[in-house]
């Protein structure tokens, strides 16, 4: 009975509803939820239900794609390209040179890549669970200016689908104004693969955000942050941040290298402070 019902919903009813976008999406999501409930009842045809669930999730994904226009789809592809390139860079363990090693174990490394230039990699441990760190960096990204003094503002310009956003970031000038204020327009995507979360991005063009007075428009990417539970203690999070950025302007490479590596070290410090203060605030509620 259930197989026939699924075929009816996904086949006959789909043809009938192909021009009713909201209902299609709602139906696909509802079907997924019902299948999840069935899987918990057991014992039963768990294997078959899992197969149908995967098909329904794929259907829901395809329906979402059909609601996006060509420009939005191009942004999604840019985000996925940034993710792929970033993971390829991080996957190559050869050629990394140490820039900074902190007493707490934080480490910044760098390497020079053809067609990209010098990239930096931060390796740090945050003593909070992955979901907490992910929530701060993704769900609360527009609040980053509250706790990271190197960032003036992060603003979401557009949300595309469930994993992709276009953002405008304003970076503060460095002490002594050695490097003036920069801003960036980026496409960002977030993915979760098992217990690993990946936040990737790269610069993009967005008609609604032309160059701003008082800021030099920089370019970044491919760049990403990889979050995973620390193997020795899953209540802590291992953070790996790949940074690839072009600050533009006439700046000596020595200054750029110093600024970018220090920016990563500072980020880890400020993130820890934010996570600690957030936990303390929750404990007082």
Swiss-Prot record:
GO BP terms, alphabetized: cholesterol metabolic process; intracellular cholesterol transport; regulation of steroid biosynthetic process; steroid biosynthetic process
Assembly: May interact with TSPO.
Subcellular location: Mitochondrion
InterPro entries: StAR, StAR-like, START-like_dom_sf, START_lipid-bd_dom
Occurrences of domain START (ranges): 67-280
Keyword terms: Lipid transport, Lipid-binding, Mitochondrion, Steroidogenesis, Transport
Pathway: Steroid metabolism; cholesterol metabolism
Catalytic activity: cholesterol(in) = cholesterol(out)
Pfam families assigned: START
Protein function: Plays a key role in steroid hormone synthesis by enhancing the metabolism of cholesterol into pregnenolone. Mediates the transfer of cholesterol from the outer mitochondrial membrane to the inner mitochondrial membrane where it is cleaved to pregnenolone.
GO CC annotations, alphabetized: mitochondrion
Gene Ontology MF terms in the entry: cholesterol binding; cholesterol transfer activity
Highest rank taxon of the organism: Eukaryota
CDD domains for the chain: START_STARD1-like
Protein name: Steroidogenic acute regulatory protein
